[in-house]
Amino acid sequence: MAGLAATFGSGAMTNSIVEAEKADLFFIIGTNTTSQHPLIGSRIINAKERGAKIILADPRKIQLADYADIHLRHNIGTDVALLNGMMNIIIEEGIYDRQYVEERTENLDQLKAVVSRYTTRVVEQITGVPVSDLEGAARAYATTGKAMLFYAMGITQHATGTDNVKTCANLAMLTGHVGRPSTGVNPLRGQNNVQGACDMGALPNVFSGYQQVANEEVRKKFERAWGVEKLDGKVGLTITKMMAAAQKGDLRSLYIMGENPMLSDPDSSHIELALSNLDFLVVQDIFMSETALLADVVLPATSFAETAGTYTNTERRVQMAHKAIDPPGSARDDWDIICEVSRRSGYPMSYRSTADILKEINELTPSYAGITRERLTKGFGLQWPCPNEEHPGTPYLHKDKFTKGLGSFLPCDFKPVSEVPDEEYGFLLTTGRIYYHYHTGTMTRRISILEREAPEPLVEINPDDAKRLGIRNNDEVELISRRGSIKVKAEVTDRVPERVVFSTFHFHEAPVNLLTNPVFDPDSGIPEYKGCAVKVRRCA
């Protein structure tokens, strides 16, 4: 979210899911929407059937490619060059929204200076996208009435992820596609409450509502509310930095909740070394994950069906969840476990229920001030910002002005993936998810119908590459990077271009993150899961 926060002043989806029904055009980049957000994907397809256009930017031939009017099949990691090329065309042809840019943005001259270097021929050379497709996409996006841009981890899980998001924002502002219904820049979050977790300060630099820990007045407000003194104003560590610190011995203990870094973090052999080097590891989860098996203490938590509270979804909508069944054994709600640990550590917390916690959120978090329990029980949720109990919620952001005032063009230059294929490691591995499984499979691989549909890991390889290497469907192949190797069955398919292979991180039998590169975006701390150099060989 660092890219949107820098350009717009707010790091969240600008518009609402339902607005897809009235969009004229969708620009979809770095999101396999029908597989990873299928309900949103269905809305996009329904809109297409009513006449909307789709521009898809994805190196793989995903399902949405069958519906796309233009498929920009760019080389992995060349998103900035692609977007800069589109903006250069839009500026050169004078089809940007001059009034919007003059009244609502700043730094246009800096943007022009950077994108002018991205001529159609230069961009074609970098991205592999034909000039005609680039021009068609630029003109369609700039001249349509209402265009929604959707993105996800396909552009954020790069060492240049923040640059990618800034450049998406630049394109949307240049064409006036922000601050109106059925427009905007819309990140699709990777889990059902990841937006809510970020909103509540599960980040190293903020309290709830993105109130900076470095701000002394903010700290004083929370000190008064919590009855403590001298809250630390130092920004903490991201996950990747935590693991590096643990490996060096600078971090001695970790408390991990609902996370399985043994499968989900890059270069996972070093993750095991880091966790094993801790003096004390606590894992709070609903199943014995690969990470929980390394813990000194495992605290059994409740699943979504066994607890009450709220979720904040990808469109900033806060919704009430009600307990459906009792938890098994000694499992307890996450918040209740935290309160008990805090009490035993010498700081009693007085929350008696999730209602008490939400009341404190209302008092301390301005964007949630009007999202009360009473209001949530009467409807289908409220979208922040909702500053008071009379406010209806905000379906789309930046209507009259950006959160930061003027939207800032923050031009970026193209940088290649950190690990470029070479003579020894001749393929680029990109990773992601499939329709039937979720993240590290801790939950979905325990569901028989999903295991039936996707029982084993596969690696997608292009038919021409497969023929050259003597690989056929279902042959066992070995993927080798500079960090490790795995064996997996091949799926020969033109979904991937030549010299690219794709696999998922759902399967502990073939932990693909043994291979991935632990470099990360300097602003967001997100690792580069979407591109690392590997060699591929057929097993005997």
For each feature predicted by the language model, list its residue ranges:
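Extracellular/periplasmic loop regions
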Residues: 195-198
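Surface-exposed loop and adjacent secondary-structure segments within mature catalytic domains
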Residues: 201-205
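Long, compositionally biased stretches
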Residues: 374-463, 468-518, 536-540
